[in-house]
Amino acid sequence: MDTGTHVVMGIALGGIATLDPVVGSDPAMAHAVMIATLAGSQAPDIDTVLKLKNNAVYIRNHRGFTHSIPAVLFWSVIIPAILYLFYPQADFLHLWLWTLLAVVLHVFVDIFNAYGTQAIRPFSKKWVALGLINTFDPFIFISHLAAIAIWYAGGSPGITFLSLYIILVGYYLVRLIMQLRIKRKLHEMIHDEIESIIISPTMKFRQWRIAVTTAHAFYVGRSMEGHVVILDTFNRVPVPETDVMHAAKQDDNIAAFLSFSPVYRWEVDTFKDHYEVRFIDLRYRSKGHYPFVAIVHIGHDLTIRSSYTGWIFSEEKLQKKLKLGSI
């Protein structure tokens, strides 16, 4: 989820914590727990600073190790340990438990995004992405703001936020049912044997992005108001084992893209003084354009000249990025 949603979830969890007698009966303890749940709700996203280095490092690592089981345990210990220095009278066990719950909740809700996390690392480096909830979901965010307003107006924080989360469980179940219906329709529409279906949510409640992989083709579509439409179809052509493609895969930007994207197509163009290899993620079609790409320019001597991976919405901007990234 986005930073703002994690913040309001941290506040909500701090409110629910007041139902714990150890927390609710001690204002200082309640204050410490609120700080802990806010910190715990943000800690796994500390890897966002990797954006300052480059997109390749960020794509490879964001929501990776910082969302893993060892990291969850680390955050749940270090945060209350620091807070205990300032709140020595706090009950450390309960402070730790609420911090742990905040970190676990952060990782858990991120699993439901299309991006996913490496939540089961170190047992597996697989990205777990259920694709039920958009990174920013208006209903989830606004409902949290409403609950915070009720608390501010004098409502019980514990009862208010606990009631909200019961409602949100129902909301997630509704999203799951919607996704399953789309999958059923896709199996009815596509007669080729389906290998995988990726359904990604959007900001709009009843609109989803679709990418289907079969043995021979990729199908890209949308589900709008319950109607599934296939917008593009691409032949599924294996990536060739050529010297140019081998050189491309050695580039950090290309390698990062391939480690992250589960469904993509590729293009190779030959120019007077270089080759251009392009990989295009098929999950994020927007207004007829596929904005998430990785591209590399390779000289005829197979040396990397420039490369880029990330979100690009015009060819002009892409070429500027490549010029800035020239080696």
UniProtKB/Swiss-Prot annotation:
UniProt main location, coarse: membrane
Source organism, top-level taxon: Bacteria
UniProt entry keywords in alphabetical sequence: Cell membrane, Membrane, Transmembrane, Transmembrane helix
GO cellular component: plasma membrane
Membrane topology note: Multi-pass membrane protein
Keyword Magnesium: no
Effect of gene knockout: Cells lacking this gene display increased rates of transcription of mutY, fabL, sspE and yfhP.
Disulfide bonds: none
Induction: Autoregulated. Transcriptionally regulated by sigma-K. Expressed during exponential growth.
Matching InterPro entries: Transcription_regulator, YdjM-like
Compartments reported by the entry: Cell membrane
Transmembrane region(s): 68-88, 92-112, 127-147, 148-168
Keyword Acetylation annotated: no
Function: May act as a negative regulator for the transcription of mutY, fabL, sspE and yfhP.
Record PANTHER family: HYPOTHETICAL MEMBRANE SPANNING PROTEIN, MEMBRANE-BOUND METAL-DEPENDENT HYDROLASE
Protein name per Swiss-Prot or TrEMBL: Uncharacterized protein YfhP
Species per Swiss-Prot/TrEMBL record: Bacillus subtilis (strain 168)
Annotated gene: yfhP
